[in-house]
A protein has these predicted regions:
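Small/polar loops that bind or transfer phosphate-bearing groups
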Residues: 10, 67-70, 119
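Conserved hydrophobic packing residues within short motifs/helices of P-loop NTPase cores
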Residues: 7-9, 90, 117
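N-terminal Rossmann-like dinucleotide-binding module
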Residues: 1-45
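Rossmann-fold dehydrogenase core element
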Residues: 104-119
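Short helix-capping segments at alpha-helix termini
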Residues: 25-27, 85, 110-114
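Short, Asp-centered acidic motifs that coordinate Mg2+ and/or phosphate
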Residues: 29-32, 64-65, 88, 115
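Conserved beta-strand termini and adjacent loop/short-helix elements that scaffold enzyme active sites
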Residues: 36, 51-53, 119
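Beta-loop-alpha module in the N-terminal Rossmann-like domain of NAD(P)-dependent dehydrogenases
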Residues: 48-108
Length: 119
């Protein structure tokens, strides 16, 4: 089975908890997190790297997918940038706070041929 490398953007309660769950899943590996407030702490717990820039994070060869768990109003940038880098996306719900942002995020993922899931 191929191991999928996951990044997590936003390591508050939901992001950190999803990381803990994914760490135990066969075929999944948390490779890096990005969060200016508690990224270092969560990275240490998960045994992964810390990144401070979305472009650097998404340019990593070992990042196949990203979990976006930032505050709801901050979902758009990490989703659109992930799509631009060809990284598949799982985004916490709600996807965004406006129809326009949702539309832009979905269209960006479609345009770049990446999988976009919300939950």
């Amino acid at each position: 089975m191929k191991t999928i490398g996951y990044a997590i953007v936003g390591t508050g309660y939901f992001g950190a908890e999803l990381g803990r769950i994914m760490k135990e899943e066969e075929g999944a590996r948390i490779v890096a997190v990005l969060d200016p407030e508690n990224g270092e702490t969560v990275a240490k717990e998960l045994g992964c790297d810390v990144e401070t820039d979305l472009d650097t994070l998404y340019s990593r060869e070992d990042v196949d997918a990203v979990i976006v768990a930032t505050p709801n109003y901050l979902h758009k940038e990490p989703v659109v940038k992930a799509a631009e880098h060809g990284v598949n996306v799982f985004c916490e719900k709600p996807i965004a706070l406006s129809y326009e942002d949702c539309d832009e995020m979905v269209k960006s993922c479609q345009e770049h041929g990446v999988t976009f899931m919300a939950g």
